[in-house]
């Protein structure tokens, strides 16, 4: 560990607010019921971290696996109804396991269940944030999971790595810890390449990280790729991420002692404004705008609003005020924001200067398709 990494880990170790994400492979016994001994150990470590003046939020998976075990199922169900039924049954055991473990360590647990709607709706987003911050002020440990019982494809977050990244944004966390069944992010899949080595530290926006990340296991929904994506999501609130093995004894204590465990993905020092964090965190867009190279440059380098003259194509069916994605000529997402005009209106004015809006539409509502205050780079 070099001097720069050592200094960064020491700063992170003493940071105030941590989000700890624990996946199904760790919270359960290979998908067959909860690993209560492991949960008790993490709870004891969290109590030590809390005693050092830090705040901790837990994002935990395992409800579907626990419910399946209680139902006698040997594999993850395929149908949505069965998944939701298993989640409903398993969530009872999951939250009780955490409640008892945290209580044994002298801590108060609080259950929070979220869906994408709670993030996408601005009012519910702010209310979720207020609730979480109030729980921290009261000294409780929020135990958070996706509400699989009611989530449909339209409102699913997708996996708890993504949820952990969003929670980090919600509460302006200093550190996101993603515990997994691997030592951290490797140079290659260690199950296929015996020469793979651990990446100790890297900037979260390193373009090579996603290229070397792999897939997930049978019970979890997220592989290493989703963990890197979650780290990038968390970085929007200047939250650094450590991906480490949850099976390493005392892993949270080691992180609290600035030990070189896992992979540290460094976030930039600057964070997005709160409103733009919310915009960037909303996963479900209603449509997309294809931009020319000039428009991409204006958005990325000058921080200006999106004008119709730089739009080459319109995709999807969206209304005024709905979220749209801005796609560059290379097919990569550049930004997302709230549309000032519907898809039908945008089709009529794409490629035109704002001075011709009234001619084509019969009215001029706004000069911009997306105002810079409602636009977030991704």
Residue map of PLM features:
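C-terminal catalytic "cap/lid" subdomain
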Residues: 2-76, 80-108, 112-378
């Amino acid at each position: 560990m070099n001097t720069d990494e050592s200094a960064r880990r020491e700063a992170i170790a003493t940071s105030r607010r941590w989000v700890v994400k624990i996946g199904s492979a760790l919270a359960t016994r290979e998908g067959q019921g909860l690993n209560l001994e492991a949960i008790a150990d993490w709870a004891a470590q969290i109590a030590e971290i809390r005693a050092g003046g830090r705040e901790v939020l837990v994002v935990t998976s395992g409800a579907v696996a626990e419910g399946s075990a209680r139902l006698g199922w040997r594999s993850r169900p395929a149908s949505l109804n069965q998944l939701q039924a298993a989640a409903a049954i398993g969530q009872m055991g999951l939250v009780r396991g955490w409640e008892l473990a945290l209580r044994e360590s002298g801590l108060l647990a609080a259950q929070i269940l979220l869906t994408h709607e709670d993030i996408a709706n601005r009012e519910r987003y702010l209310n979720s944030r207020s609730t979480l911050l109030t729980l921290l002020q009261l000294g409780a440990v929020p135990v958070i999971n996706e509400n699989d019982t009611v989530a449909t494809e339209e409102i699913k977050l997708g996996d708890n790595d993504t949820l952990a990244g969003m929670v980090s944004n919600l509460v302006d966390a200093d550190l996101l810890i993603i515990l997994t069944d691997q030592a951290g992010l490797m140079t290659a899949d260690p199950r296929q390449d015996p020469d793979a080595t651990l990446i100790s530290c890297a900037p979260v926006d390193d373009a090579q990280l996603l290229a070397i990340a792999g897939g997930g296991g049978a019970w979890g929904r997220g592989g290493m790729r989703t963990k890197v994506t979650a780290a990038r999501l968390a970085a929007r609130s200047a939250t650094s991420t450590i991906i480490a093995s949850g099976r390493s004894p005392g892993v949270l204590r080691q992180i609290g002692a600035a030990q070189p465990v896992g992979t540290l993905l460094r976030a930039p020092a600057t964070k997005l404004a709160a409103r733009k964090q919310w915009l960037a965190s909303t996963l479900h867009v209603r449509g997309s705008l294809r931009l020319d190279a000039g428009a991409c440059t204006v958005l990325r380098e000058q921080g200006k609003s999106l004008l119709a003259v730089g739009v080459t194509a319109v995709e999807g069916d969206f209304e005024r005020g709905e979220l749209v994605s801005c796609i560059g000529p290379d097919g990569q997402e550049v930004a997302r924001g709230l549309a000032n005009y519907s898809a039908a209106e945008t089709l009529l004015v794409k490629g035109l200067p704002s001075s011709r809006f009234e001619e084509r539409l019969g009215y001029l509502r706004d000069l911009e398709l997306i105002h810079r205050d409602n636009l977030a780079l991704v």
